[in-house]
Amino acid sequence: MDNKLLLEATNTYGSPIYLYDLEKIKSQLIKFKESFRSIGDIKVQYAAKALSNISILKFIKNLGCGLDAVSIQEIQIGLKAGFKAKEIIYTPNGVSIEEIKEAVKLGVKINLDSIESIKEFSKNFPSDSIFIRINPNIFDGGNDKTSVGHSESKFGIPMDQVDILVEMEKANKIKIDGIHVHSGSDISNIDSFIKGAKTVFNLAFKFKNIKYIDLGGGFKVPYFKGDTHTDMNKLGNKIGIEFNNFKEEYNKDIRLIFEPGKYLVSEAGVFLTKVNYVKEGAKNKFAQINSGFNHFIRPAFYNSFHEIENISNPRAKKEKYSVVGYICENDTFAENRKISKINKGDILCFKNAGAYGFSMSSNYNSRYTPAEVCIFNNEFKLIRKSQEINDLLTNQIIIDL
């Protein structure tokens, strides 16, 4: 998306806004599938948590993907977007049996990650088969908050508890037809993926009727020129060798599943904001924008780096700025970053904002969530309106005091 197009979007819809390029999502999916060509027909379950706008989900569904959902609400939105229940895998963590029952009623595939929840599930649904999520004891990922496959993580069934499930299956107390592993986000080390895959392949021999192996997601995309990222072709070749050897030995038809989220949508999205003031501080020069971590929390929460470009004045000499928001605490997006000279009213573009941007936004400070816009067939499409005051008050009740 060129700067002229981005500026046109802010002229039409105002700012701040999230803007998504649907063709980029499509091209990322094609690249992803091509990386695993040695395996054949892989199953792609898009991770809805990355970006769950219903129009984006509909587009991804039309590309032939299934859906990875982590909440009953993601399931419901997915169904409204057009996914069939059988195309959705539900992978909750620590939810109540009531929510799981609701998911079963909707007809989606259940993937559970604790002995406790599996035992309760088997009492209620003894004839239903499930996936199980394993904790492979792998510590990797771009941030401690997103590393979810290590021994101290709340996610997944520890390896030393797997035999409990083997005995449950032998006693016909549970039916297991899929094994799932997901170690984290922003993993560039291919060996971590291979270790997770080998762990699951070896576990499959303990069970009688495995039909699916789900290797999750977590593929790292580059955030700036020269940044590390997952070498997808290299990973695909290595996974292909391991999987084809495993399938030959297992001697049953097994389908491989992946759950890309960020890989598909991160680079397809930008976040556009306007500069309210350029403030001279005691030591720093601040670019104060009309947004905060209520809209885009990744830099504050994950300490993530996002390129920031002044698209109103891209060829100007670069100066150092700390880009900050309007929230009542230190919501710093970038500190002493070299950016083309910034003036009041300029539009700043945050790159790689398609994943975990809007989906992690909030109404902190009673601020409105921003609009979402996509580009489809060379046209802008508004896919979410910015909030208004009534949106903040809709579910509140004023009582007599």
Where are the model-predicted features located?
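A charged N-terminal "starter" segment
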Residues: M1-K109, I115-D128, E152, E167, ...
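Charged (often Lys/Glu-rich) extended helix/loop segments that serve as interaction or gating elements
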Residues: N3, D253-L401
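General structural feature for long, well-ordered alpha-helical segments within catalytic domains
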Residues: L5, D21-K24, Q28, F32, ...
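Conserved, mostly hydrophobic/aromatic
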Residues: I25, K49, S71, A103, ...
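Active-site-proximal loop/turn and secondary-structure-junction residues that shape catalytic pockets
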Residues: A48-S52, Q73-E74, G94-S96, S114-E116, ...
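Glycine-rich, aromatic-flanked loop segments that form ligand/cofactor-binding clefts
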Residues: S127-F139
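Active-site loop/helix belt of alpha/beta enzymes
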Residues: P136-Y277, I339
